[in-house]
Every structure is written in C-alpha cells, then in structure tokens.
C-alpha cells in the first residue's frame, strides 16, 4: 500500500460555514483542502436573494486565510415567497450556483423553508429554464413518519414528482443516507446527482446508539442501519459520476451538542478529505477517491476541474478534543481518536 496519495484538489459540494466570529475558523478548515465549496444558506435570517448572497459571500472572502484562493459558491434558500425574478437575478449574478429546498422543519434553521413542494413549482420551472440547480434536503417532516423513514417517504411523495415534472432541472439529492436514495439516483436521468458525506460512509446508527448516545454522531438526516451504509459505500466507490463529495460539515458549539436536546450536525471540515480517504481505503478503492472528490462535482455543475493537486500521507495523528469556534469551541468528528491519513501541510 502506498504511503502517499496525490489527487487533483477537491471541492466540497455541501458545507455549512456559519457566520460571524465562527467564519475565520470554518473557512480556514475548508480552504486548507478544498478549492471551492457550495455554501449552505440556512443562516438566521436565511440567504434568500442575490443581494443577501453577495453580502454573505463578502463575509466569507474576508475570513479567508492570507493568500487563500478559496471560492465560495453561493446558494439561495427557497421559501414559499421566492419568486421567479429572484431566480433570474441569482443566475445572472454569476456567484449564485444553486437554490436549496429545505422542507420547513427538516433541519437546522429550516423554519422558513418550503411548506409544500407545489408552492414553488413556478420557481422550479424558472430554475430549469435558466439552468440553476436545485439542491434538496430530502426528508418529509410529518410527525407521524418515523425519522428513519423520512428520506424514503420524501422520494416517493415529493422528489419523484419534481424530477418527473421538470425533466431538464438539475437536481442534487444532498447527503443521501439510504439504499432507496442510491437506487433512485441511479435510475434517474443524468440531470440528477447526489452528495455523500464522510460520516455516513464511516458510521451507521449502531455507532451512535450502542453503548451510550454519542451526540457528536447525531446529524440530519440521521445515521441509518448498516445495510444503507453499505449501499452508500458501494455508490461512492462505484465510479458513477452521479455521486460526489459533499461533507455536510455542520458545526455547533460544544454546549449545543452535549445537551438534553442537542443540535444535529457533525463537524468534519477540519479533516474531510482524510476521513473520505479512510472510508475509501476500507473498501480498497483509493483509486476511486479522486473522481468522487475532484471530478464528478464540477462536471455535474458545469464548472472546470481544478488543476492543482493535494497530497495525503499515510500517517497516524490524534484528532484534537476541541477546536476554536468563535468565542466557543466545537468538538470535531473523531475527537480524541486517531486518523490514518493526513493532508500535507504545504499542500
């Protein structure tokens, strides 16, 4: 087994950077390894139009480390009040690359999300016309639906309707977690892709629940049983261009995770590519990591692939117990444990 792995610099097609005092920390972690990232818009208040996207973009650019060329790719947050004109202006901006569907109540800061998919059909039609991709948090939120089944219900009740009605609309089914989602994406047209997180490749619900609740593995969509984890690993290492890297790195302060009602989200951006390398190595598929991390995402979005490279070295290192997060700290995934790959510091 080689002790070094060189690949085109990857991009992250789904990340949460948060805002304010946290930005210098989250942006630095992302910029260390990624050239570009799709920036989630679920701030308070959310990023609803091109003007708000530009303001957030400028805050991110100001937080970049000295000399960094990290490029934030901005996203609009769809609401029941989003208009076709909002979409046209976003597309014309050149810096908004997608719009995000959060079903109301599905995840962090989603209260302003879409209450019924039919409410935005006019907006989706405009998105298809102008070529602005739709990003989807794929879960229903009805209280009678078991949390482990919400992704499948979303496919059957909503996503299948969207892809049938708008066959030219580019759709990214984000952070998929089930075999059902893998099969849906595989069967769909070339306009439908999916991101897969490192934590859903490395863990299943037993890791979160057996022997005690591990709050730093709690995320939404929640970890599923191991048969779904295996389906995700098969998809990520298959070489299919429909599946690409999206960390869904979602930091929360330590006190907000380690609480009676803890927040959902795993912080992985500090070592994202190392975590993916570990998952791919477990499948003896390190040769498939570069296409998944560096080729298929930009290809789907119609953007050029990066030209510079990064190098991973196979060496063990200890993950810190916590990392700075504004005036708070965040507990990263695998805190206090060891990782087996490390990005060269001069990459």
UniProtKB/Swiss-Prot annotation:
Species, as recorded: Stutzerimonas stutzeri (strain A1501)
Enzyme Commission code: 3.5.2.3
Originating gene: pyrC
Disulfide bond residue pairs: none
Reactions catalysed according to its record: (S)-dihydroorotate + H2O = N-carbamoyl-L-aspartate + H(+)
Subunit architecture: Homodimer.
GO BP terms, alphabetized: 'de novo' pyrimidine nucleobase biosynthetic process; 'de novo' UMP biosynthetic process
Pathway recorded for this protein: Pyrimidine metabolism; UMP biosynthesis via de novo pathway; (S)-dihydroorotate from bicarbonate: step 3/3
Name assigned to this protein: Dihydroorotase
Taxonomic path: Bacteria, Pseudomonadati, Pseudomonadota, Gammaproteobacteria, Pseudomonadales
Chain positions recorded as Zn(2+) 2 binding sites: 100, 137, 175
Keywords from the UniProt entry: Hydrolase, Metal-binding, Pyrimidine biosynthesis, Zinc
InterPro entries in UniProt: Amidohydro-rel (IPR006680), DHOdimr (IPR004721), Dihydroorotase_CS (IPR002195), Metal_Hydrolase (IPR032466)
Domain of life: Bacteria
Binding site for substrate: 16-18, 42, 137, 220, 252, 264
Pfam families: Amidohydro_1
Chain positions with N6-carboxylysine modification: 100
PROSITE patterns: DIHYDROOROTASE_1, DIHYDROOROTASE_2
GO cellular component, one term: cytosol
Function: Catalyzes the reversible cyclization of carbamoyl aspartate to dihydroorotate.
Enzyme superclass (EC): hydrolase
Gene Ontology terms, MF aspect: dihydroorotase activity; zinc ion binding
Active site, UniProt feature: 248
